[in-house]
């Protein structure tokens, strides 16, 4: 009797005691065989069975980058096209603060909000999308909660699979790295600031501070010393942000971007209003540091007006700042060494603005202050900032310009009753002092200049200021021309100024210091080609120079030049060739500031 061969026994698989399917089958809604230690169906499909218990998810990963596995399940719409259902994967990888390259149009509305901003970035696409939510488990990690939708390109091959992988055609697992960069916690100055405020602060530190000096030395730019102080003085923070917002608004306006320009302008005006409100509350603080910071805020309000158009309330700001300068410098007080360079540079800018503003701004008799203009305090303050001032004008020449402004008809507090003979003698003394000033010696003795500074260009700018100061004296006291001083005829001075200005290329860093002499010589000349050349130089400062961004006062200077030329040409047609454009301009009570 032949023995019957028994069929081989099938391998025994222990059944799971639980009735719940494994994690994979449960997610796919498949019938699970509930085998132990792993589901047999997962093994056949080449997948790793995740078991029957609770799936653990990482909630505090310290890695700066992570690979997020996302499952997208294909479904069929009623029109027969395939769609995908996104799954959500949670991670706690920190994210970075907004970079300066972000457009300000995409930033928060409240520029001083202290809460963490919520970012939402989305793209509409016909392909499948992956939604990733970043959770914030602890407040100390300062992680912004946001939702990022990343489009999945079906034409791009996923990461290589193992040879035994056999993916389910109804589902697809795509692993793609998500680079999430941590927030830089090393700079506490930005903590508590909104995204837009951080953008404005970055713009101030990188662009505005560069415009305020002759040559930007990152470690020696005194205006950057104001940034660490904005956390302590709220009015200073508002002024700094307002200045940066106005600067951005001017740039967008020049580029023809009306919406960003209007948005930044609204921010600037709101921040300026807030700064003025905070300054009123802090004006009674009597400590030395408080006075210095209030002075800084007021002078930056003048800078804000210059960036806007050079018009506005800069006169009131300059007057208030000069009173603070008197209390700081005349009391022989010693400032903290950390803020002394900042205060010196700001005080010098304030007095320089006062001097240039007095040249064409109508009656300035209310500005007379012998305690500042006594020939001792004024040069001392200006000399402390010679290496930083972008005007590149010698303090002695600036003082001559101020004295000539006080001699100008209708603006001098020392008008003589002897037919103006005293004014003529004083003006002649100013001319003699200006002509004998050694520009080259002054430039080569300036302390603190960078080694790569173009000293010859500085000599040309300072020489142009010296010749323009002489021309300004002749225009302020026209009777001085009767003395017939050699080489001091207006036409000779015009050619001298143009010669010095032509030595400075359009793309030179010191071109921004030539605005005032270019304006003076352009207003004086009657030659059409010279007028066109002066206007072209101002346009170069406004648009073409790579070392400075558009400031509104430069555009105002161009508009005023064209108006002066129109008045002079109209007077010439009527037979009046001897019009004094400076006297005519001062008679209009113009409040423009051209520096």
Curated annotation (Swiss-Prot):
Q: Which UniProt keywords apply?
A: DNA-binding, Metal-binding, Nucleus, Transcription, Transcription regulation, Zinc
Q: Write down any Gene Ontology CC term.
A: nucleus
Q: Which GO terms describe its molecular function?
A: DNA-binding transcription factor activity; DNA-binding transcription factor activity, RNA polymerase II-specific; transcription cis-regulatory region binding; zinc ion binding
Residues in the DNA-binding region annotation:
22-49
PROSITE patterns given in the database record: ZN2_CY6_FUNGAL_1, ZN2_CY6_FUNGAL_2
Q: Name one GO biological process term.
A: positive regulation of transcription by RNA polymerase II
- The keyword Disulfide bond belongs to this UniProt entry's keyword annotation: no
Bias type Low complexity, positions: 69-88, 118-138
Q: Name one Pfam family in it.
A: Zn_clus
Its localization reads: Nucleus
Bias (Polar residues) occurs at 89-117
Q: Where is this region: Disordered?
A: 69-172
Chain's role: Probable transcriptional regulator.
Question: What is the name of this protein?
Answer: Acriflavine sensitivity control protein acr-2
């Amino acid at each position: 009797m032949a023995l019957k061969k028994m069929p081989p026994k099938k391998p025994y698989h222990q059944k799971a005691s639980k009735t719940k399917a494994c994690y994979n089958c449960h997610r796919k809604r498949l019938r699970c065989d509930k085998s132990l230690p792993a589901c047999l169906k997962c093994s056949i499909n080449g997948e790793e069975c995740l078991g029957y218990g609770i799936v653990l998810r990482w909630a505090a990963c310290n890695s700066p980058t992570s690979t997020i596995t996302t499952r997208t399940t294909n479904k069929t719409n009623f029109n027969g096209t395939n769609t995908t259902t996104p799954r959500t994967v949670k991670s706690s990888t920190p994210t970075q603060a907004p970079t300066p390259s972000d457009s300000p149009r995409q930033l928060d509305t409240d520029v001083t909000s202290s809460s963490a901003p919520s970012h939402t970035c989305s793209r509409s696409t016909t392909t499948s999308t992956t939604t990733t939510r970043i959770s914030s488990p602890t407040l100390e990690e300062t992680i912004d909660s946001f939702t990022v939708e990343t489009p999945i390109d079906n034409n791009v091959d996923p990461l290589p699979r193992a040879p035994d992988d056999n993916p389910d055609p109804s589902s697809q697992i795509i692993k793609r790295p998500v680079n999430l960069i941590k927030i830089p916690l090393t700079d506490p100055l930005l903590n508590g600031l909104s995204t837009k405020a951080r953008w404005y602060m970055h713009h101030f530190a990188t662009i505005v501070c560069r415009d305020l000096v002759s040559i930007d030395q990152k470690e020696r730019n005194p205006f950057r010393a104001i940034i660490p102080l904005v956390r302590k003085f709220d009015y200073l923070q508002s002024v700094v942000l307002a200045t940066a917002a106005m600067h951005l608004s001017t740039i967008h306006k020049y580029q023809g971007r009306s919406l960003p320009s209007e948005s930044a302008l609204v921010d600037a005006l709101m921040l300026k209003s807030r700064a003025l409100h905070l300054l009123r509350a802090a004006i009674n603080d009597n400590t030395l540091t408080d006075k210095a910071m209030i002075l800084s805020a007021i002078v930056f309000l003048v800078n804000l007006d210059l960036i806007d158009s050079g018009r506005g309330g800069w006169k009131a700001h300059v007057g208030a700042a000069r009173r603070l300068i008197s209390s700081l410098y005349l009391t022989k007080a010693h400032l903290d060494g950390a803020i002394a360079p900042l205060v010196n540079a700001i005080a010098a800018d304030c007095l320089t603005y006062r001097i240039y503003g007095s040249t064409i701004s109508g009656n300035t008799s209310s500005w007379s202050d012998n305690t500042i203009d006594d020939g001792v305090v004024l040069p001392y303050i200006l000399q402390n900032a010679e290496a930083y001032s972008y005007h590149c004008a010698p303090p002695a020449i600036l003082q001559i310009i101020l004295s000539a402004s006080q001699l100008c008809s209708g603006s001098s507090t020392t008008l003589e009753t002897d037919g103006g003979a005293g004014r003529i003698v004083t003006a002649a003394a100013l001319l003699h002092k200006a002509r004998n000033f050694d520009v080259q010696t002054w430039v080569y003795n300036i302390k603190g200049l960078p080694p790569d500074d173009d000293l010859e260009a500085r000599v040309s700018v300072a020489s142009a200021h010296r010749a323009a100061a002489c021309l300004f004296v002749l225009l302020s006291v026209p009777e001085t021309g009767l003395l017939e001083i050699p080489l001091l005829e207006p036409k000779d001075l015009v050619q001298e100024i143009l010669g010095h200005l032509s030595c400075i290329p359009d793309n030179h860093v010191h071109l921004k210091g030539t605005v005032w002499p270019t304006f003076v010589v352009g207003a004086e000349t009657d030659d059409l080609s010279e007028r066109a050349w002066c206007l072209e130089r101002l346009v170069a400062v406004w648009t073409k120079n790579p070392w400075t961004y558009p400031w509104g006062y430069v555009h105002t200077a161009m508009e005023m030049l064209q108006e002066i030329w129109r008045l002079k040409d109209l007077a010439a047609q009527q037979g009046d060739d001897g019009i004094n454009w400076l006297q005519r301009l001062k008679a209009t009570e113009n409040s423009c500031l051209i520096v």
